[in-house]
Amino acid sequence: PTMLEEAVKASLWQLAVYDEKELVAYIRLVGDGHSVIFVQDLLVRPDHQRQGIGRKLLTEALATFPNVYQRLLATERSEKNLAFYQSLGFVELSDQACTGMIYNN
């Protein structure tokens, strides 16, 4: 199996959306499901964007784990991404009483 196949198998939760037999959107969470979940992937094919599919997937994911203390994601910084995630209740870590860091090896 490839690294991607192993990563998908080890995921906490995932959901895919198909149009007929064609994959058009996918969300994948990692974490323990109790204290933390991390939105590892939220992908919507460009020709299916702006239709509410990503919003529905993320809403379903968050509703599946309502009592998790930390719900995190990391994404490319853009006004579009900021607006989308903020509309769903996410805030930037810099606005919180915590520090977000990444390890660069």
Task: Give the residues covered by each predicted segment.
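Conserved beta-strand-loop-alpha-helix junction that forms the acyl-donor binding cleft
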Residues: L72-L82, G100-N104
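Active-site rim helix/loop that mediates acceptor-substrate recognition in acyltransferases
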Residues: P1-Q14
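Active-site/acyl-donor-binding loops of N-acyltransferases
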Residues: V91, D95-N105
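Conserved acetyl-CoA-binding loop-helix of GNAT-fold acetyltransferases
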Residues: V44, R50-A63, S87
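Conserved GNAT acetyl-CoA-binding A-motif
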Residues: L58, A63-E76
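Conserved active-site tyrosine of GNAT-family acetyltransferases
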Residues: F84-Y85, F90
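Conserved beta-strand in the GNAT
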Residues: A16, K21-G31, S35-L43
